[in-house]
């Protein structure tokens, strides 16, 4: 662990929750290549005898019905919990696919609507009992998800059967699944001519041979390929969508009211970032947005910073809306750390950042970052994994993050994609000490997003 100084460590300790761990608190982690949702009992995970074991896993819920030949289907990459905590909305990035067969990008995304109580019951293990129904995402490569009262707002990162070509933010009715509209984001300015706008759909049998399928590719840069999506609130009460545009190395600002009125010009600004961002999050008060600058889709280069955006300045279309850029995962600006999916603590004072390439997690003090003080990364927590089934110890490769409601623990998902079933990992970090309190093994394969729920029995 790296701590800036004793005063900062004390500040971190004072700001975070001190309450006892509640019963019926669960981590819900996406299994990704293992297309199930993993429910982990937090209290059980923290028991010393369960460390570095899968013992705290309560159930593994299917995110799609099995194929007729018995193959598991689905591609869970993100999860958002309903306002009442009873329903989980799981984003199947490429829909109900067989991960062993579907080896490229650009599948039709869907949302699996799942019952949280059933997901956290042992009798649901390896069943589809918690799955209620699917909702089509309205486009391809769904990743980001925001809940409005009546609608889903979905970030679709790709086009049909290719990782590039994503420029649609779709609005889908939560009750019926009807596609109500879409915002088509402007194309980027990569320095060469871009295709006609809007993006045409390619043949349902696959893209023509000249179309590149996977990044990095020097011909990309036209399409935003939006990954994460979040909502910020300006001081006047107006709401804005922010999308992390991995393809154009920036963040889009969308006037939510205009988008809901069907405006074709709801995107009001673009905020340049270090490199293509992936994860994005908003502080509890809605004032600050953080984007993790992951990697370029044009060249083999990974980022090492987070961008902090002032919602008021973004709403005003100010070119100075990125008010801070913080180096994470390293003290050397030449080292690529690949930050992934950030989270705010509930009080909005700290940002948790998993750094995929650096195999660590950064804790960033927001006030220090905004003041441009050195040492805003007040803690850096190294992560390790036990050996896989073949005896090889592989890197941690953290991706997803979430924070418990009391602010005491950060939960991190990770592990490289392997040929072994259930080879992923979840780490539980005690934010009072900046150390790993527990490690849960056997959580999916290449897990991405995760959430913490209090079942409230």
Where are these regions (language model features)?
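Bacterial N-terminal signal peptides that target proteins for export
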Residues: 1-7
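Bacterial N-terminal signal peptides
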Residues: 9-15
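Predominantly soluble domains enriched in secretory-pathway, periplasmic, or organellar proteins
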Residues: 19-457
């Amino acid at each position: 662990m790296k701590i800036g100084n004793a005063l900062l460590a004390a500040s971190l300790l004072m700001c975070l929750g001190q309450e006892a761990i509640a019963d019926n608190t669960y981590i819900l982690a996406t299994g990704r290549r293992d297309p199930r949702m993993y429910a982990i009992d937090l209290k059980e995970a923290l028991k010393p005898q369960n460390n570095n074991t899968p013992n705290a896993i309560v159930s593994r819920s299917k995110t799609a019905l099995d194929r007729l030949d018995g193959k598991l289907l689905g591609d869970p990459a993100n999860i958002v919990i309903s306002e009442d905590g009873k329903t989980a909305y799981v984003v199947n990035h490429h829909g109900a696919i067989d991960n062993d067969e579907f080896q490229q990008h650009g599948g039709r995304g869907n949302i699996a609507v799942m019952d949280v109580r059933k997901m956290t019951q042992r009798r649901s293990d390896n069943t589809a009992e918690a799955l209620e129904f699917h909702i089509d995402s309205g486009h391809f490569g769904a990743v980001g998800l925001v809940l409005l009262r009546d609608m889903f707002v979905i970030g679709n990162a790709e086009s049909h059967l290719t990782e590039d070509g994503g420029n649609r933010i779709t609005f889908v009715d939560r009750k019926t699944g009807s596609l109500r509209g879409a915002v088509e984001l402007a194309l980027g300015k990569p320095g060469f001519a871009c295709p006609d706008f809007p993006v045409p759909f390619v043949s349902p049998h696959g893209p023509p041979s000249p179309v590149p399928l996977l990044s990095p590719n020097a011909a990309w840069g036209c399409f935003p390929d939006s990954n994460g999506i979040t909502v910020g609130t300006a001081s006047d009460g107006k709401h804005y969508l922010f999308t992390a545009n991995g393809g154009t190395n920036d963040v889009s600002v969308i006037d939510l009211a205009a988008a809901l009125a069907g405006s074709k010009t709801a995107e009001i600004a673009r905020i340049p970032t270090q490199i293509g961002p992936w994860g994005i999050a908003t502080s509890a008060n809605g004032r600050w947005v953080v984007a993790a600058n992951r990697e370029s889709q044009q060249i083999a280069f990974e980022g090492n910073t987070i961008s902090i955006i002032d919602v008021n300045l973004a709403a005003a279309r100010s070119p100075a809306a990125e008010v801070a850029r913080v180096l994470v995962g390293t003290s050397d600006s030449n080292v690529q750390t690949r930050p992934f999916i950030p989270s705010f603590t509930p009080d909005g004072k700290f940002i948790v950042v998993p750094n995929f390439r650096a195999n660590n997690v950064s804790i960033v003090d927001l006030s220090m970052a905004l003041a441009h003080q050195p040492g805003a990364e007040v803690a850096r927590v190294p992560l390790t994994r036990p050996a896989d089934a073949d005896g090889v110890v592989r890197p941690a490769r953290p991706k997803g993050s979430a924070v418990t409601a009391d602010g005491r623990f950060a939960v991190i998902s990770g592990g490289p994609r392997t040929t072994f079933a259930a080879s992923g990992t979840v780490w539980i970090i005690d934010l009072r000490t900046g150390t790993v309190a527990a490690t849960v093994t056997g959580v999916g394969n290449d897990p991405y997003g995760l959430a913490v729920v209090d079942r409230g029995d």
